[in-house]
Each structure stands twice: as structure tokens, then as C-alpha cells.
Curated annotation (Swiss-Prot):
GO terms for biological process: translation. The lineage of its organism: Bacteria, Pseudomonadati, Pseudomonadota, Gammaproteobacteria, Enterobacterales. The keyword Nucleus does not apply. Gene3D superfamilies: Ribosomal protein L33 (2.20.28.120). Belongs to the bacterial ribosomal protein bL33 family. GO terms for cellular component: cytosolic large ribosomal subunit. It comes from the Bacteria. This is Large ribosomal subunit protein bL33. Keywords: Ribonucleoprotein, Ribosomal protein. NCBIfam families: PRK00595.1, rpmG_bact. PANTHER family: 54S RIBOSOMAL PROTEIN L39, MITOCHONDRIAL, LARGE RIBOSOMAL SUBUNIT PROTEIN BL33M. PROSITE patterns: RIBOSOMAL_L33. One of its GO terms (molecular function) is structural constituent of ribosome. It comes from Photorhabdus laumondii subsp. laumondii (strain DSM 15139 / CIP 105565 / TT01) (Photorhabdus luminescens subsp. laumondii). InterPro entries: Ribosomal_bL33, Ribosomal_bL33_CS, Ribosomal_bL33_sf, Ribosomal_zn-bd.
Length: 55
């Protein structure tokens, strides 16, 4: 079987709470690291989430 072109990634909160989201990303069309603003339920506000590898 062929290896898929989508990688599993983890989006970690920049607020330092340890909260994270998991998602997939197409590594061929988006080689740069993903950053997006999402809701952090620990601090109850929208903060920047940055891409990290899933261990």
C-alpha cells in the first residue's frame, strides 16, 4: 500500500496551558508550519495554536 500524503499533526496552545488539538495536513501543498487562532477552554479565550509533531 502507498503511504498517504497527509500527516497527523498536533496544534499546541501558545498560552502555555498544555491544551492541544489534533488534525491532519497535506505536506505537499503546505510544507510550512501551521499556525491558527482557536479557542483554548482552559483560559476561555481565543489564542494562537502552533504546529508540533505527534510523538
Amino acid at each position: 500500500m502507498a503511504k498517504g500524503i497527509r500527516d497527523k499533526i498536533k496544534l499546541v496552545s501558545s498560552a502555555g496551558t498544555g491544551h492541544f488539538y489534533t488534525t491532519t495536513k497535506n505536506k505537499r501543498t503546505m510544507p510550512e508550519k501551521l499556525e491558527m487562532k482557536k479557542f483554548d477552554p482552559v483560559v476561555r479565550q481565543h489564542v494562537m495554536y502552533k504546529e508540533a509533531k505527534i510523538k
